[in-house]
Amino acid sequence: MTSRIGVITFPGTLDDVDAVRAVRLAGAEPVELWHADEDLKNVDAVVVPGGFSYGDYLRAGAIAAIAPAMKSVVAAAERGTPVLGICNGFQILQEAGLLPGALTRNEGLHFVCRDIYLDVENTSTAWTNQFAEGTKILVPSKHGEGRFQASEETLERLEGEGRVVFRYVENHNGSRNSIAGVCSENGRVVGLMPHPEHAVETLTGPSLDGLGLFQSVLSTLVS
């Protein structure tokens, strides 16, 4: 039976179509979810994609975090459903309380758009278990507010518990500890700023490395 992965669309979402394609290329059935609907249609996992939900008013991700669909995502995550937040989706998961830290204006206050290398630091999460230890992946990065910030106590906890999932090889936005992505305590909720869904085809992406995240969650769902 094919796994079903939901992709949420908010007003201002940009990368939902790309996430849907990545899910399909990985071998799962994508299910389009609307922000105003509480019904997650019995999906097996959820992707919260990037963009500028609600125009980033108040704070990036702040309004989207209280949308009906996100209330259901929080409840599903608490039951163990795998959830991936990409870029603005990462911000939304933080605002919803599913992931720690905050994402602020980039160092230098410029929007950055380039292909970057990430170290995969934790290969045991629901979204990274198909990567080998020590793997570097090449994926696009495009954001103006991607600088990971957290208190010293939170940073120590994340590092000590192995919850830093991705780390920038070259820290291009000033993130604390070069953190690009983190996970929940159980490793089933992952958020990262760069865009794996844009690295799934050689024609349009810098590599196929992004497919690994979507293939990993399929492995999680069938295990």
Curated annotation (Swiss-Prot):
Naturally occurring in which organism (per UniProt):
Corynebacterium jeikeium (strain K411)
Residues forming the Glutamine amidotransferase type-1 domain are: 4-223
Kindly state one GO CC term assigned in the UniProt record: cytoplasm
The active site is formed by: 87, 195, 197
Q: Where in the cell is it found?
A: Cytoplasm
Q: Name one Pfam family in it.
A: GATase_5
MF GO annotations: ATP binding; glutaminase activity; phosphoribosylformylglycinamidine synthase activity
Q: How does it assemble?
A: Part of the FGAM synthase complex composed of 1 PurL, 1 PurQ and 2 PurS subunits.
The metabolic or biological pathway listed in the UniProt record of this protein is: Purine metabolism; IMP biosynthesis via de novo pathway; 5-amino-1-(5-phospho-D-ribosyl)imidazole from N(2)-formyl-N(1)-(5-phospho-D-ribosyl)glycinamide: step 1/2
| Protein name, entry field | Phosphoribosylformylglycinamidine synthase subunit PurQ
Q: What gene codes for this chain?
A: purQ
UniProt cross-references to Gene3D superfamilies, sorted A to Z: 3.40.50.880
Q: What is this organism's lineage?
A: Bacteria, Bacillati, Actinomycetota, Actinomycetes, Mycobacteriales
Q: Which NCBIfam families match?
A: FGAM_synth_I (TIGR01737), PRK03619.1 (NF002957)
Coiled coil regions, renumbered to chain = none
